[in-house]
């Protein structure tokens, strides 16, 4: 009787230990996407890396999903662009159904740089924001221009929506394919109401500024000399950053 009780107790202890170890491994595997300003970085825990085109970096979140950014350019400043379309939103949701192609006066630009909008504390911590270097217009987040994207292959320009983007779409007219259209900041020179967008095939075409079915795939500049906390820079295991450098 005592032997049976002892065996049962040992089995229970082993089961608890295996469960604890398994949960620890799961948490460790996902840690590279769940970082914030509360992370403590020791002198030997972070490392310097030379970022290259197509490296992936996790900064912030949207609709509860971590945002993975792709390195687009590494010249004077490191340009990042969202790996996926984060939401569908009109460039200028005008009542006339047409709108204006003026990006600098657009509600979309204002939303991208507003704490009540895209830069909500729910999406970006103070640490996340410290990693961003504003562009020449003082914007932390912006839509990529056609010129920024013209040297990227059509295949690499294509973007698919995030899972939460699809779940939160309110348009009953939207038929989602693998890839979707998304905005650039570039107006169509011959039409004050049309904006250049990237299509499902990765090409450029125009759409009305009031189009609510066009996606938002934002861009940002990364501050210089950042340190990497963990990750390998791939889509599956993006870099998590530890700060450093100048904005």
What is each of the regions a protein language model found here?
Residues 4-5, 22, 30:
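Intrinsic N-terminal pre-sequences and regulatory tails
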């Amino acid at each position: 009787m005592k032997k049976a009780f002892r065996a049962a107790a040992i089995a229970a202890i082993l089961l608890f230990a295996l469960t604890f170890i398994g949960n620890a491994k799961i948490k460790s595997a996902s840690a590279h996407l769940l970082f914030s300003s509360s992370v403590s970085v020791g002198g030997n825990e972070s490392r310097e890396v030379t970022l290259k085109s197509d490296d992936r970096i996790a900064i912030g979140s949207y609709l509860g999903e971590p945002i993975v950014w792709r390195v687009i350019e590494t010249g004077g400043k490191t340009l990042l662009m969202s790996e996926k379309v984060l939401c569908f939103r009109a460039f200028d949701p005008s009542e006339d159904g047409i709108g204006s192609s003026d990006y600098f006066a657009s509600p979309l630009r204002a939303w991208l740089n507003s704490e009540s909008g895209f830069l909500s504390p729910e999406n970006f911590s103070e640490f996340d924001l410290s990693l961003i270097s504003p562009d020449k217009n003082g914007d932390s987040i912006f839509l990529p221009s056609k010129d920024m994207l013209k040297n990227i292959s059509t295949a690499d320009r294509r973007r698919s929506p995030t899972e939460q983007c699809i779940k939160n779409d309110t348009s009953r007219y939207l038929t989602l394919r693998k890839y979707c259209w998304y905005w650039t900041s570039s107006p169509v020179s011959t039409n004050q109401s049309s904006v250049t967008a990237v299509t499902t095939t990765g090409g450029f075409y125009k759409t009305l500024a009031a189009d609510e079915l066009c996606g938002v795939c934002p861009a940002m500049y990364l501050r210089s000399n950042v340190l990497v906390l963990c990750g390998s820079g791939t889509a599956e295991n993006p870099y998590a950053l530890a700060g450093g450098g100048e904005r």
